[in-house]
């Protein structure tokens, strides 16, 4: 379809999704891209997934000294820009959507524009996350503002339509001078995550009481606070804690859990295919993260019928999911989190009632089908707006 044309406005689109790692469901950004690709196809669109691990448009890994080693601990790889592969993947496409602002994504946008194809981009990498991975650099005044500026300079200034997964990150972009058209669209959750059967009214609190958390085992996800809170709980001996993820703090968290927790615990990687069953087997979801653009793991837990207890942090959008005060605690406050955990254990009927409420709310507001329809509307708007200039 010609740029700016409104002809065949409702026809299926050919969309190229450009993501560094396209075959890794353990990485949040890749997981989102794979979910969107699957749902786009289900809705009748043609998707060309371009990236490392893609079966149709595979890209080689780009090795950056030290940086790649650190990124690998977060299940993240950098893709090597490949103009020839981009031209092959983009031929006949209606629009190109890029997920990350690195050299690979920049070349994808440049190639698309050279071919007369509009490009959009998602803002999935929070600068605060980058700084937490960089250790003491996060304490440098103005460091996060510089990264917001740098990302805009690197990629987003060449893009008019930007997908932001939450209102929080959209507000951050506005505060840091982004003047583009921002589309707040949740990443959504897979329909594989269905609600568990809640316990009958009057049933006692389960023993063991299973608490689950999911996320990278890194400092900004603050699983340290969760472990300390479980240790402080009046029901500590009855709690079974599962933390799903991999990352640089895995060994440290295991040592801490072994020292502090009297009950059973498990910390480590869980295959994405096993997550729906695991979540339905648990009783409470805790999300202690300090930094989050949205948090897919909270959506998946709520869709599974779990009540969430979420850290309230100015750098995290996850708190938006809380429907009552008992689902919130102040970030990095293990005593307050322990109180929240104890309240839910002491009120099993409320736990069941709110579990059903959270499941229904999530199904209505955050289904992948509705999110992808909004995404397609953004892409159609970008196609109509495109004037062929870089």
Predicted regions, residues:
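Aromatic "clamp/platform" in nucleotide-sugar-dependent glycosyltransferases that forms part
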Residues: 101, 290
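Short hydrophobic beta-strand element within catalytic cores of glycosyltransferases
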Residues: 307-311
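Conserved acidic donor-binding segment of nucleotide-sugar-dependent glycosyltransferases
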Residues: 323-335, 343-348
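Nucleotide-activated donor-binding/catalytic signature segment of Leloir-type glycosyltransferases, i.e.
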Residues: 251-273
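Short alpha-helical donor nucleotide-sugar binding micro-motif in glycosyltransferases
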Residues: 90, 269-270, 277-282
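Conserved donor-binding/catalytic core segment of Leloir-type glycosyltransferases
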Residues: 16, 202-232, 242
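Membrane-proximal helix-turn-helix segments that form the acceptor-binding/catalytic region
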Residues: 114, 126, 143-161, 176
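Carbohydrate-associated surface elements
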Residues: 168, 188
């Amino acid at each position: 379809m010609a740029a700016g044309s409104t002809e065949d406005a409702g026809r299926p689109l050919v969309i190229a999704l450009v993501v560094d790692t396209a075959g890794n469901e353990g990485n949040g950004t890749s997981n989102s891209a794979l979910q969107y690709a699957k749902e786009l196809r289900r809705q009748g669109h043609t998707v060309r997934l371009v990236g490392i691990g893609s079966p149709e448009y595979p890209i080689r890994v780009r090795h950056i000294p030290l940086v790649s080693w650190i990124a690998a601990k977060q299940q993240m790889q950098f893709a090597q820009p490949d103009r020839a592969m981009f031209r092959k993947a983009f031929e006949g496409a209606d629009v190109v959507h890029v997920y990350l602002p690195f050299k690979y994504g920049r070349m994808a946008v440049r190639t698309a524009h050279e071919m007369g194809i509009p490009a959009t981009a998602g803002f999935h990498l929070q600068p605060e996350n980058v700084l937490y991975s960089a250790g003491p650099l996060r304490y440098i005044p103005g460091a996060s503002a510089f990264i917001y500026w740098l990302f805009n300079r690197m990629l987003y200034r060449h893009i008019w339509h930007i997908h932001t997964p939450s209102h929080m990150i959209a507000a951050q972009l506005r505060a840091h001078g982004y003047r583009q058209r921002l589309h707040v669209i949740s990443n959504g959750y897979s329909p594989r995550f269905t609600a568990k059967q809640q316990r009958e009214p009057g049933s006692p609190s389960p023993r063991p009481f299973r608490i689950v958390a999911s996320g990278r085992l890194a400092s900004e996800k603050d699983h340290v606070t969760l472990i300390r809170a479980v240790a402080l709980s009046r029901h500590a001996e009855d709690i079974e804690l599962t933390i799903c993820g991999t990352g640089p703090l895995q060994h440290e968290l295991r040592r801490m859990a072994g020292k502090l927790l009297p009950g059973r615990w498990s910390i480590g990687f869980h295959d994405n295919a096993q997550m729906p069953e695991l979540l339905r087997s648990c009783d409470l979801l805790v999300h202690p993260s300090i930094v989050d653009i949205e948090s897919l793991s909270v959506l998946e837990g709520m869709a599974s019928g779990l009540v969430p207890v979420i850290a309230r942090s100015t750098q995290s959008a996850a708190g938006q999911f809380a429907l009552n005060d008992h689902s919130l605690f102040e970030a990095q406050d293990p005593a307050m989190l322990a109180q929240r955990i104890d309240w839910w254990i002491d009120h099993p009927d409320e736990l069941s009632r709110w579990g059903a409420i959270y499941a229904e709310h999530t199904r209505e507001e955050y289904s992948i089908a509705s999110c992808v329809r909004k995404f397609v509307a953004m892409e159609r708007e970008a196609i109509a707006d495109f004037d062929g200039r870089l």
